[in-house]
Amino acid sequence: MSLTRLLIRDFRNIENADLALSPGFNFLVGANGSGKTSVLEAIYTLGHGRAFRSLQIGRVIRHEQESFVLHGRLQGEERETAIGLTKDKLGDSKVRIDGTDGHKVAELAHLMPMQLITPEGFTLLNGGPKYRRAFLDWGCFHNEVGFFTAWSNLKRLLKQRNAALRQVSRYEQLRPWDKELIPLAEQISTWRAEYSAGIAQDMADTCQQFLPEFSLTFSFQRGWEKETDYAEVLERSFERDRMLTYTAHGPHKADFRIRADGAPVEDTLSRGQLKLLMCALRLAQGEFLTRESGRRCLYLIDDFASELDDARRGLLASRLKATQSQVFVSAISAEHVLDMSDKNSKMFTVEKGKITD
């Protein structure tokens, strides 16, 4: 699907905007602080229920307003879908799909698979394991029907188990939680392992094109010892878990490690190379989704020119065009994106929250 229409009201510094969009490249050009990133963030929020620059809802709603409103129209091969999200200062959300309320944010995420590339996105490579788990879980969410329910139940059970660890004295008292937790943990770990194995060749091929000077390897670590049943690990770790008051092993501790020439990429690659690698991984995810399901990602790229020279920008632009996906790109100057433009592209100028084309 592509986003053909976007309405923004009281989001960040944007009072009101109604944008007719291209199914190909859409460029947002303006000075720092003009609001171009806010447009990208509005699209991201419409598909995720939360912003990517702040978790505090008060910072996202325009000054002295009570809520923001986002609406979009998604065009698929056979039908159009109307979607909407309203969120107030208390954090209460209302999701509307095709005119009916009561929907969940996860439904928006399923309708709008998107990849976000920002200057802060290096956390995928040099941040904690939670960022790489999120990378895997994005793929599992869009490829496995039961993943979201299983993942939600896992979070609930871990929270309950950790609370119980403060009160119990014997492992047998934890068995009611572990009876539910163990099969969920093993299923989620299996899905993650299958996804990481399935996408490995896509990542290798894309990374070879972007960073041919390095030999890159990828490894999935499930969060507990290899060749060991999770049930055995939980029982064996009981005393330590009770002392820590949290569950030290499991899928919530999984990681997905990337090495260049045998060393961690964060210790080996320059910032420009790290950005290229991040872009390669996001592209590989999108291409894998298209091959497996026929669905295309929507790409959001903030500050396109940062960290990349002309040759690398050209390579990224070429690969993005080859995906035939909808792409939104912000840049300080139109000169940075003119070579990506074609007859189907749209160029928007953003100034103090006002957007013109």
UniProtKB/Swiss-Prot annotation:
* Subcellular location(s) of the protein: Cytoplasm
In terms of one coarse class, where is the protein primarily found?
Answer: cytoplasm
Q: Name one GO molecular function term.
A: single-stranded DNA binding
Q: Which GO terms describe its biological process?
A: DNA replication; DNA synthesis involved in DNA repair; double-strand break repair; SOS response
Q: Does the UniProt entry include the keyword Transmembrane?
A: no
Record-annotated residues binding ATP?
30-37
User: What pairs make up the disulfide bonds?
Assistant: none
Its keywords, alphabetically, are: ATP-binding, Cytoplasm, DNA damage, DNA repair, DNA replication, DNA-binding, Nucleotide-binding, SOS response
Q: What GO cellular component term, any one, is given? A: cytoplasm
Tell me the domain of life: Bacteria
What Pfam families is this protein classified in? SMC_N
Identify its protein family. Answer: Belongs to the RecF family.
**What task does this protein carry out?**
The RecF protein is involved in DNA metabolism; it is required for DNA replication and normal SOS inducibility. RecF binds preferentially to single-stranded, linear DNA. It also seems to bind ATP.
PANTHER family to which the protein is assigned, alphabetical: DNA REPLICATION AND REPAIR PROTEIN RECF
* Protein name per its UniProtKB record: DNA replication and repair protein RecF
